[in-house]
Amino acid sequence: MKNRLPADFLWGNSVSSMQTEGAWNEGGKGMSVYDIRQPAEFASDWKVATDSYHRYREDFDLMQDLGMNCYRFQIAWSRVCPDGDGEFNEQGIAFYHQFIDELLARGIEPMICLYHFDMPLSLAERYNGFTDRRVMDAFIRYGQKMIACYGDKVKYWLTFNEQNLYHSPEAFLISGYLQGEKTLRELYLIQHHVMMAHVHLTHYLHQTKPQCLMGGMLAHALVYPATCKPRDILCAQQLDEFLNQNLLRAYAGEGYSPEVMHFVAAEGFDDIYRPEDLALMATVKVDYLAFSYYASRTLNSDAIPPGTAVNNYMLFGNQDNPFLKATEWNWQIDPLGFRTIITRYYNDWRLPVFPIENGIGVIESWDGEHPIADDYRIAYHRDHINAMKAAIFEDGAQVIGYLGWGLIDILSSQGDMRKRYGVVYVNRENHDLKDLRRVPKKIYAWLKQVFRSNGEAM
């Protein structure tokens, strides 16, 4: 008998608010940290993005035509609560009600992510973002309000996009941190406050909307040791423990990793972890494990200076993998790594797995006439979907669905419109908005047959 994916398997798209919405000063929205970022040669400002605030119905029609039945989007905190901890903006709340209703009317399951790096500017300026527990409290309040508003319409929830990034040096770029020395202690303050906000909101969702599901999400780049040298293997294992397994253990209700907590105590940071925090954490478990995946990485321990904190290993030890092809951004294409992560998640934690970001970013420019011929994107998605199928049918993993990233072109995470992931081209450049026209690429027809056949027609 031929293996087939479940009839309710989810196929779709995943985005953030600041990379899509635009309308930075409309509808009562407050300022976020992105609104003060300055454009550069290869970075747009964030004022318009792809204008989905005004064009979302057009985008939803394309998604429906493709056969998508899931859309993961993010609520802009400063759109629904301009200062982050003050009065809620009813106009912003109404916008997302209409947004969700338009998805549901097209048979598309919404998934809400509550935070994707765009801290309300007021909280960043007053408290330096998630270094301060008051920002954690403000986020919990905001999240509870969103769950109360939309929990009867939306089944799938996430608190934080790619939560393990708060365990890496990137934490200072995404947590509302505006000033300071970027110390290791501050890094652990940020990661714990983010984790506890997740714990409180998972508990609240389960208590108030038991029909809803909360996920925990990582940015998971499988890290290989550069050689079979024992130290390479040890360092790769340590990095995985600190950046990935530590959170996976917490998501599964086991608390933080003993190895990480031993390090915390040795550094004198254990006062960050209040007993009541750890007690609550031990009672909370997510409903599914989500992750983004684009590439794997390779770690050379010889390049890591003595005394380097595990969180910072990749600043020094990152190495190209000679066995993998890479994108022009030097992201190493590795479908087998995708399978490995899915299978390991399910083997280790027995929780449903949901890969909710996957894709290939390429510099593309439309000639105004012919569709972008992105055969490389067809190959990338085909190989990764087949790897996911192998995890399901050969390894026994339980998988909820497959979401691509930015399948209608969006600004990159750095604001660079040149780097495109979409199956639909959005006609704008970094500093020329043009007409923002949506133009299907070659992959559009292929992905449509994949989605509409539930992964059969590859």
Please give the residue ranges for each predicted region.
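Active-site region of glycoside hydrolase catalytic domains
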Residues: 1-40, 64, 83-84, 93-458
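A common structural microfeature
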Residues: 8-10, 53, 70
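Aromatic- and Gly/Pro-rich amphipathic surface segment
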Residues: 30-61, 66
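Catalytic domains of carbohydrate-active enzymes, especially glycoside hydrolases
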Residues: 55-76, 283-289
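Glycine-rich, proline-tolerant flexible connector loops at the mouths of alpha/beta enzymes
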Residues: 75-88
